[in-house]
């Protein structure tokens, strides 16, 4: 863990380090999220990764049935992102397991992953890939976890928020990068910074815009910049029907 982490982010990483493993047995084959995104792009279909989360440090607090939500999103989304962090997002491994056994589209386990056993859990629970956040790992840790996830046939989504993060992601050979407009420490959104980072990423990397997307015109603007997919959580949790507007 990098020494500079503080506040809720330091707390959530420490909780992740202590989190026990979950006993489960995978019931489905790996379905590649990044490859499905590229298929959507070829067919000119807007690739939305619909996120399921009950709450967040930025203010979301919504209760929806996870199976009902996921089955609805399965008809429109390229994949699902399932928050499994317990304290700050009210997520659970059990929710991920239930969703994975109910849908047949790719699933991203979104958590604060800091150790290999969490990747074991993701695979065993039925997730098809995991989120690795550059900000909460040393470069050596990040590279090791990336290779470990790939040993399962997963291509992790590597999340960045600034140029230093991007440099690290490219150095370790990231093929699938999430550009988060929200600073995880301050929780502030900076869309100009996100757009600048997008312009710096090579065209052969699959790019996902994360956080703060609530309108169709934002998706159109980001697509023109070369974004391949859009991870949307709060907006869809508040109003699931909005995905129909996003994919028009």
Curated annotation (Swiss-Prot):
Pathway: Amino-acid biosynthesis; L-tryptophan biosynthesis; L-tryptophan from chorismate: step 4/5. It catalyses: 1-(2-carboxyphenylamino)-1-deoxy-D-ribulose 5-phosphate + H(+) = (1S,2R)-1-C-(indol-3-yl)glycerol 3-phosphate + CO2 + H2O. Its EC number is 4.1.1.48. It is an enzyme of class 4 (lyase). The gene is trpC. NCBIfam families: PRK00278.2-1. Belongs to the TrpC family. Keywords: Amino-acid biosynthesis, Aromatic amino acid biosynthesis, Decarboxylase, Lyase, Tryptophan biosynthesis. This is Indole-3-glycerol phosphate synthase. It holds the Pfam family IGPS. It comes from the Archaea. CDD domains: IGPS (cd00331). One of its GO terms (molecular function) is indole-3-glycerol-phosphate synthase activity. It comes from Saccharolobus solfataricus (strain ATCC 35092 / DSM 1617 / JCM 11322 / P2). Monomer. GO terms for biological process: L-tryptophan biosynthetic process.
